[in-house]
Amino acid sequence: MKRYYSTLLVLVLAHTSLSAYAHTCPDPQTTSLQWGVPPSPWIENPFSPNSPQGEENTRFVRANILVAGYGQGVTCTYRNSVGDFSILWQVRTKIPARVDYSWIETMGGYVCTRGLNECQFYVADPS
């Protein structure tokens, strides 16, 4: 019986550790965004004012968690000389905790403007 419980505990801990991996927006200097191509699984946001442009001075502006009852996706907005552009990852995300002051609750979800590494989010369903 102890063997059963220990095996169950290991499986639960493994699942928890795998699902608790923090994600951030892609870095425009070290990913395919430097060539104007969103890295997989990200896509160009269809509502973005501009297409992704490969430019040396591209910088991160903000991240948004889109909410419709629960997290429906993440958009990351960047700025360069052409203007702003955003990319989208349509994935279920966990809602940030109220004590996570990096994320500010807005009408349509949450926004983070602190920085690329500070705007961490958690995927609820990695598949």
Where on the chain are the PLM-derived regions?
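Mitochondrial intermembrane space
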Residues: Y21-S127
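N-terminal signal peptide c-region/cleavage motif recognized by signal peptidases
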Residues: H15-S17
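Bacterial N-terminal signal peptides that target proteins for export
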Residues: M1-L8
